[in-house]
Amino acid sequence: NLTDTEYEITLIDRTNHHLFQPLLYQVATAALSPSDIAVPIRSLLSGYRNIKVIFDEVISIDKDNHLAKLTDSQLNYDYLIVAVGARHSYFGNSEWEKISPGLKTLTDALVIREKIIEALELAEKENNPELMQKYLTFVIVGGGPTGVELAGAIAEIAKETMIKDYKSFKPEDTKVILIEAAERILSSFDKKLSEQAKEDLEKMGVEVKLNTKVETISDDGVYTIQGFIPAKTIIWAAGNQASPILKSLNVETDRAGKVIVNKDCSVPGNPEIFVIGDAAYFEDENGKVLPGVAQVAIQQGKFVAGIIKNEIPFEKRPVFRYKDKGTMATIGKAKAVAEIKGIKLTGLLAWLVWSFVHVFFLIGFRNRFRVMIEWIWYYLTKRHGTRLIVGK
């Protein structure tokens, strides 16, 4: 919306790539390569004369002086859009992060991928049955879309995709356990879809533990209110918190640190600053808090760009209204759940819709083509091609 204007636009990011996060779990589970879902930011924006990209990190925001402070410099702004997303929340137990990585970045995905593959390699050469079982047990904490998709993908890896390559253990020796503190997984989905997802996971060999809170995590496993689960591979998908940079705005936030924004997505008292996406706490006209999903951020981005482009004064700005285009989650090969405009889909049809939507929203023909080929190859052969351990 702003590329055909006289505005000078500066995009600041601490990574040099745009990441398609919905498929990040497939990098973590060796289905795709990082380059399949990431594109250099500069290559995306090189054709726009008024956009400058800076590879840096914003440390704080001085809203009184209209300054964004970077690691070793600062930038003036007339308008500021803060779209910094969210990070993992370990609910005050930051020491768990080293043991139980979350999934937000490509680095996270590669760490998880190597943990999974390395666990299988270590199990292959282990003579102690008890220790071997720890290597063959994979625990995912959190039953939201990320946790469900990870659990399904790891189950396919451990019980189908890679199991033929190992001789010391059988598919039934592996355990995939999904832990959820609430009474059902996919709590933001329709209850019937949630139940279907649980049923599909269990058919794939995933043990789903509901109403189970994690008390602590150690190198040897997970302690829950129901007992101890011995495991060497633990993945965190249970909570998010806002970026600490938002604290420098000195405005009201929710418990997760998200900025409580005005109905035009601006910061109270500073109509020139907008906070969108996972960084924002926004209630719709019914008092419902908007979810932290990509379609919310995309719609808010376009909305805010329109306000800036048309230089609409604060008192005349329209109210942002979110249009829900549906929710979906994949569970495994030919297994998914989806709800689109009230229509509920499951199984193969939901999986086909999920596949089409995700390929469609990938940036670039090359990425779309490569992902389609990888998926077709896996569908026909049940084998993933990106199983390297490179961090050792």
Name these PLM-found stretches.
Residues I51-V141, T224, I235:
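FAD-binding core/adjacent interface of flavoenzyme oxidoreductases
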Residues M132-F189, Q196, E207-K209, G292-I308, ...:
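Rossmann-like dinucleotide-binding core of oxidoreductases
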Residues G85-H88, A151, N240-A242:
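Short glycine-rich anion-binding loops that position phosphate/pyrophosphate groups of nucleotides
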Residues A305-K392:
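C-terminal, flexible cofactor-proximal segment of oxidoreductases
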Residues N1-I54, I59, F138, P145-S188, ...:
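Beta1-alpha1 glycine-rich phosphate/pyrophosphate-binding loop at the start
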Residues K98-N128, D220-Y223, F228-Q299, G306:
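FAD-site-proximal beta/loop scaffold in flavoenzymes
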Residues R49-S60, A155-K263, G269:
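A Rossmann-like FAD-binding core segment of flavoenzymes
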